[in-house]
A protein has these predicted regions:
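C-terminal outer-membrane beta-barrel translocator/porin domains of Gram-negative envelope proteins
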Residues: 287, 350-368, 375-384, 439, ...
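Outer-membrane beta-barrel translocator domains and adjoining extracellular loop/strand segments
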Residues: 146, 180-181, 327-330, 363-370, ...
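Outer-membrane beta-barrel "beta-signal"
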Residues: 449-455, 566, 667-678
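Short loop/turn motifs that connect adjacent beta-strands in outer-membrane beta-barrel proteins
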Residues: 268-278, 306-311, 337-349, 403-406, ...
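Structured extracytoplasmic
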Residues: 1-101, 107-116, 173, 177-281, ...
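Transmembrane beta-strand segments that form the barrel wall of outer-membrane beta-barrel proteins
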Residues: 134-138, 278-289, 299-300, 305, ...
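Transmembrane beta-barrel strands of outer-membrane/channel proteins
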Residues: 315-319, 351-359, 408-414, 449, ...
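Outer membrane beta-barrel transmembrane domains
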Residues: 433-445, 531-644
């Protein structure tokens, strides 16, 4: 299509049918056949390439106000905002497939905004239906890595006068850098056999929006020859032969080995002929450091679905050079669904038992990655208040095709303070203050039962070897959890009830970017010592973690038993920078964030206002408390960020707006991350 020599490296075919009901509204896609071959066969993390390509190069509907493409939103040339966003030119009147059409061309008012250039062929009658649409990206577009993009859509009028899409072809040329050989992605979609007959109600009762038939991967060559509307080229049809040939190239297996280790962060112990049954990793956790351990060495690994499709085993061993201690973790899990490689493949349905002895920071539970990741180990503050944890957890998780999941947990935990952290009973002369009468507590033990409900309709993700990663954050997410502490059961020392709820939603504003909103609230209903109170979601690393983590709250700085937080992140997609001379040539993009939290500590959990000896004194360093009770003023921090620097780097400056008078607090700071996006 581009008149260039193309070497196919991956091909994927899907045959499906889509059913739609207007009332009550329901739409489902039934995948009848799927066939893939190519470079992705060398990787063992599921259909990662196919999932990403499907999301990045999603279906285009020009009748929508905004077109979702490249994980961005583009203004449609016939959407409600088209008149103010595009310039239109009337070119000619001509015949398209024996129908008289008006030829229009369009270009964005600002070529660097997220929009198209192209042509519309509109039927010259009272319907003004689009007969054909051709859309391209402007040459000076602000989109990264895309050298060229062509979308061609054709529509036909059915005998009943309905207009339908019949052809939807997309060609995208990608390049990391100019002058370097790139990739070409071709997506050819043909629609046929439109029917408006009544559909069996049972089909709409099938679970999920995408239903995969059981034999979709086992279709014969005769089936594909019948349903394939565009024949494969000679190179495409001999893809398996090509893959076998490149495997024979001297040194190729070492290149693939290195690429897989770099991309997947794991080292496999098998080959293509003998698939890996055990993987070593994550690699980036092998050497780290912290205040208690000093330099820390760790070796981790997990079994794969090639060893057993249902049973999974994983764990690690670690050694700290400062405290001279060995640490370990092991997990055994049974998946009720047959898995291809990892435990968390969709839909999750498993029972797991894990036992861990390790050193932990109170903020580790909020990390989106492994706590021993060497990159997040670079902290902006000294984290010297930690704990030795012995944790035995039994987990059951069930996930449905509708986006609803339930997770039940039973846990027995022993928490022994380490480093500069000490647990002192609140039994001194003056409540909340330390003297020689206070009793030092060696450790605390809890027995817990927990239930988490989560609903994320339309969520899409890919499976890596470490975790599940969302492909898109467009889907809303609702979470509700409750944890009960049981005193007297298996040595549990406290009764408690902890409830938390959260909601996250992304809102798009066309060419003006997107707004991510996350709201969270929680309450600890019982009287408990401070290790069981609510802690703010603080990010102690220089690496930006997520939209809702507070970047300038120190370790255990605020202790609450009631809290509510709100995080707003507005990405303008370069709307401002694209209008500044010289700056717009850099293709930088701007982002603004503000995070706030209201919190309180009731008198029953405040050691300064209660003489209850079951409470603990607040954490101290050099005799001074390092944790505080929030007042009526909410904690607020704001940040201004620039991303897409060299198409790679995200940098933001964070400023603390309240509680700036606390001794030793950081009022501002710089955070960054590596971020490659279109």
């Amino acid at each position: 299509k581009t008149n260039k020599m193309i070497l196919p490296i991956s091909i994927k075919e899907t045959a499906s049918k889509t059913i739609y009901r207007k009332s009550p509204k329901s739409e489902k896609t039934i995948i009848e056949g799927m066939n893939s071959n190519g470079i992705e066969e060398f990787f063992n993390t599921g259909d990662m390439l196919g999932t990403i390509l499907t999301d990045v190069f999603s279906d285009v509907n020009i009748y929508d106000d905004d077109i979702r493409l490249l994980q961005r939103r583009f203004v449609s040339p016939i959407g409600r905002g088209a008149i103010s966003f595009y310039k239109f030119y009337l070119m000619d009147t001509l015949m398209v497939d024996k129908q008289e059409c008006v030829h229009l061309t369009f270009v964005p008012q600002n070529s660097q905004d997220f929009g198209f250039t192209g042509h519309l062929y509109v039927v010259k009658d009272s319907t003004y239906a689009v007969k054909k649409a051709i859309m391209n990206l402007p040459k000076k577009t602000g989109v990264n890595f895309v050298e060229n993009l062509d979308i061609v859509q054709q529509f036909e009028q059915l005998p009943d006068s309905n207009w339908v899409l019949t052809d939807d072809d997309m060609t995208v040329e990608l390049a990391l850098m100019k002058g370097i050989q790139g990739l070409e992605v071709q997506r050819t979609t043909k629609y046929s056999d439109y029917k408006f007959d009544e559909i069996e109600p049972r089909l709409f009762r099938l679970k999920g929006n995408v239903i995969k038939e059981a034999n979709m991967l086992a279709k014969s060559d005769e089936y594909w020859a019948k349903v394939r509307q565009v024949p494969l080229t000679k190179k495409e049809s001999s893809m398996d032969v090509f893959m076998n040939r490149i495997e024979q190239i001297p040194g190729f297996k070492y290149v693939i080995f290195g690429a897989k280790a770099l991309i997947e962060n794991f080292v496999e112990t098998g080959s293509k002929k003998h698939p890996s049954k055990f993987d070593f990793g994550p690699i980036n956790t092998m050497i780290t450091s912290n205040y208690v351990n000093g330099t820390r060495f760790r070796l981790s690994g997990m079994t794969t679905g090639n060893l057993h499709p249902h049973w999974s085993f994983s764990g690690y061993g670690a050694y700290g050079t400062r405290d001279k201690k060995w640490f370990y973790s092991g997990q055994a899990a049974y998946s009720f669904n047959k898995r291809e490689y990892v435990l968390w493949e969709f839909p999750k349905h498993y029972l797991a038992f894990q036992y861990t002895y390790d050193v932990m920071s109170p903020m580790d539970k909020y990390l989106a990655t492994d706590k021993d990741n060497m990159f997040v180990g670079w902290k902006w503050t000294t984290v010297d208040q930690m704990s030795y944890m012995r944790d035995a957890t039994l987990t059951y998780e069930l996930e449905t095709n509708t986006g609803f999941s339930v997770k039940a947990m039973a846990r027995h935990r022993n928490d022994q303070p380490a480093g500069m952290l000490q647990y002192w009973k609140n039994n001194g002369t003056t409540p909340g203050e330390w003297d020689e009468k206070n009793t030092l507590v060696h450790d605390i033990t809890t027995t817990e039962l927990g239930l988490t409900l989560r609903y994320a309709p339309g969520e899409t993700f890919v499976n890596t070897k470490q975790r599940r990663v969302p492909v898109s954050l467009d889907a809303p997410t609702f979470t509700l959890s409750h944890t009960v502490g049981l005193k007297g059961v298996l040595g549990g020392e406290y009764n408690f009830n902890l409830t938390e709820a959260s909601i996250r939603k992304r809102f798009w504003f066309g060419s003006w970017g997107k707004l991510d909103i996350t709201a969270r609230a929680g309450a600890q209903w019982n009287t408990v010592p401070f290790p069981l109170l609510n802690l703010p979601m603080a990010n102690l690393s220089y690496i930006t973690q997520n939209n809702e983590s507070f970047n300038l709250i120190d370790n255990m700085e605020f202790l609450n038993d009631r809290y509510a937080s709100l995080a707003l992140s507005y990405d303008m997609n370069g709307k401002l920078f694209n209008r500044i001379p010289l700056i717009k040539k850099l293709k930088w993009r701007e982002m603004f964030r503000i995070r706030g939290m209201w919190g309180t500590l009731t008198d029953k959990n405040n050691p300064y206002k209660s003489s209850n000896s079951d409470l603990f004194l607040f954490p101290m360093r050099d005799g001074m408390p390092t944790s505080h009770v929030m007042g009526h003023t909410p904690y607020v921090e704001a940040s201004v960020g620039i991303y897409n620097i060299f198409k790679l780097l995200h940098i933001e400056y964070v400023r603390r707006l309240t509680y700036t008078d606390i001794p030793g607090v950081k009022k501002g700071g710089v955070r960054f991350m590596i971020l490659m996006i279109f």
